[in-house]
Structure formats: structure tokens, C-alpha cells
Amino acid sequence: VTGVQRGLLAAALVALLAATAAPAADVSLKIIFPEGRTVRQMADRVSQVRQIAIHKRHVTPVLTGASYAAAAATTEPPAAFRRADTRKSIEGFLFPAGYLFGASTTASELIAQQLQTFGAEWRKVELGTRKPYDVLVVASMIERETKAPEERKLVSAVIWNRLAKGMPLGIDATLRYGLGVPGNRPLTAKDLRDPTPYNTDLNKGLPPTPIANPGLPSMQAAAHPAKVDYLYYVRKPDHVHHFFTASEQEFCQKAAEYGYHC
């Protein structure tokens, strides 16, 4: 993840921006949302920050995890991304970054900041002929699929190449999102047969919505994939990098070598 190092998150959740004591309404707090988090995970982050503010700063913010989740559920996506099928998920639009807020800041106000930042960052993405929402969905998958910045455009290429050939994407992260299965719990045979539209083993094409809130590098990678013919990738034993190939046979060989089933 770029921009925010995971090991620094705990220390950076709440930043003291004023050197002297001030009335609660004037206290400045900071929340950092890392790239690739879901709305639910962002709501959990809000709850964590609130507890730190209460116990370390002796301030009780109006903002809560529950109010953030509720506001996100009723917030409309930007007009340019409204869908003909009436889906209104805000997932993908809550831009990951650091945000300042005060004790009286509401969830709707924080979300408005995130949407404003999304708009500013999105304008930096040159879409070419690709559909904006498709690019955002692909960016969210890139964010969840690789931790290595140099692999973003390669993962993007695999996704677009498989779509062009009418191949199922077969991305576990989409199924986990659809079923709410955490990353530390193995997918079961029952999970893999689930008919959720987020099951990209069973359903061709993109999932219905983004599966996370991506940062700018993943958005740019989604819009500009690497010019390679790769169709497969498998995670290496370091759990960070992947082996990429255009050959199913080579993919299966590497998968077996790394201890996975093909």
C-alpha cells in the first residue's frame, strides 16, 4: 500500500495538531484511511479513532463508526457514475487519505470531504475509451490483489485481457467481498459455489460494484494496463509478489510449486 505504511497506522490514527489545550469544539483530530479498505473497514477505523480521541485526547467526537456506516449507506455516488441498473453503492468513491475533523464533525461532513478528494484525484486519471465505472471497479480489484506497486499495471492487464477473451476473472477477493469473508479465513467449497454476483469464478465480466476504495495509483493502473499478454498470476511464497504468465500450463506448474491447487 502506498502513501500509508501499515506499521505506522496505529501511531498516525489521531494527530495532535495543537500544542496547547483548547475547547473540545476546537480540537483538531486526524483520521487516516489506507488504500484498499471497504466502507465497512472505514467505519471500523472511525470507531478506533473515536476511542483514541476519547481516551488520549479526552474529547468525545460526534462522529461514530455507526453514523459513518449509516451516512455511507444513504450517500449517492457522484452523478457521472450513476448506474442505469439503479445500484447506488458508494463503495469505491470514499477516497483513502488523511482527513482532519473536529469534535462536532458529522459523518456526512467527513464523507463529503472524501468525495471531494475523490473528484479531485479522479480528474488526474486519463480514461481513454474505457468506461469510468469499469475503471473504478478494476482499480478496486487491483488494490486488493497486490501489495507490490510495480505489479499494479500487470494485474490490470490480466483483468482486461481476460475480459477481452470472455474468460471468468476468478478473483477470490471479489467473492470474499460479496460473502463478507475475511482474508484470514480460507474459502470453502461451498463459498466457491455461492451464486453471489461477486463470484467471478461463476460469473463472467466485472463484479457489480467496486470491492474497495482505491487510491490514485491503482486508478491509473486500471486505466493504463501494461502491454502484455498475461492471463494468469499466482502469489509467490513471500505473500507480496506474483508470478505472471500467459500460459495456463505454466500457471498450474507454478501454483503447484507454491503449494496451491490449480
What positions do the PLM features span?
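Primarily N-terminal secretory
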Residues: 1-2, 14, 22
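Short, glycine/charged-rich beta-strand-loop motifs at protein surfaces that mediate ligand recognition
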Residues: 203-210
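Conserved catalytic or metal-liganding residues and their short signature motifs at active sites
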Residues: 21-167, 214-217, 221-229, 237-262
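Bacterial N-terminal signal peptides
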Residues: 10-18
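Short acidic (Asp/Glu) and glycine-rich catalytic loops that position anionic groups and cofactors
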Residues: 135-136, 195-200, 233-235
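Bacterial N-terminal signal peptides that target proteins for export
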Residues: 1-9
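Small-residue-rich helix-loop
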Residues: 149-197, 202
